[in-house]
Amino acid sequence: MTAFRLAVENGYGMEFDLHLLKDGNLGVMHDSLLNRTTGQAGRIEDLTTEDLKNYRLENTEDTIPRFADVLTLVDGKVPLIIELKPEDGNHAKLSETACNMLKGYKGVYCIESFDPRCIAWLRKNRPDIIRGQLSENFFRDRTDLSDTLKFLLTHNLANFLCRPDFIAYKFADRNSTPSNWLCRRLWRVQGVSWTLRSKEDHDTALKEGWLSIFEGFRP
């Protein structure tokens, strides 16, 4: 929670990832696997809400937060970009649970996901929520997907089903597909670049018309 608290204190919006826990609640962590962030084996999807307090993050006193705790802390003070990270086909349940928890929340927020099924769910069930499709050049890093799926996701070909309000594309890959240009220029879909780690990249993204998701510096 320290990073979220500092973001609020400095007036920065924040982006974070949601996972569906074993008991149906939501936990906030980047990876499904626990080892990189906590040093312990397992998946966050196999934990309960009570379990979260037993997993310390990056050798700090912070433990894995609940989504409810983050909403209480922020309390509408800064905007939120909420990423849904489904596992094992739980995209619909994850999307529904997140939206239910956001009912009554007074702050500014949007929801994004790499999984087009989450974005399609939002379009059908909560079209009032700003939704974004996350993407990158999947041919560069991903070995767990078929070439067909890599092609579809890299070139934003699910967008005709999802109709995202914005596309959040990896900064280094932003010129990998003409679909980014088409979506932004012809259909006026806002482009967002992630994750920017220098002021130079931040300035370049803004100059090219991309909004910025950044870390590690003050723009």
PLM feature spans:
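Phosphate-group recognition and catalysis centered on beta-loop-alpha active-site segments
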Residues: M1-P219
